[in-house]
Amino acid sequence: LNDYYWAGPNGGAFWNGQLIHVAEPRPHTPDDWLSTPSNTHRRYAIDFVGKTRSIGATVGSFCYTARGSAIGGLIHTFGIWDIAAGLAILAAAGGTASQLGGAPLDLPSLLDGHTFRAPVLLGAPAHLPALRACIQLRA
């Protein structure tokens, strides 16, 4: 794919040498997409005006959201090793990650090597409330 993402030590997130940012705050459109896990249809009810796409890699959700290609990402069941680099890139691009219910992501609790099993939403802070409103856990 020749896609390279990194966060610089002096700030900024980059994709193939270009500075990237999360999507600007605006109403969602049918052309927007949300990166989701492959089993989303079994775990969540999503009423999103745009598309949902499973790209097969947790770090991909972070990177596509960081560059503003995806409006956001939904992830679950991960360890710190799955998200450390992606989280740094997302934060440097102006994004954040928090639990679907709105609670902050407790990173220190992941340092013991356990797997986090709750849904986490990625995106620009301004987009997260609207995304939360359209994603529900199935019973």
Task: Show where each model-derived region lies.
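Acidic beta-strand-loop-alpha-helix segment within the catalytic core
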Residues: 1-63, 114-139
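Oxyanion/phosphate-interacting regions
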Residues: 63-139
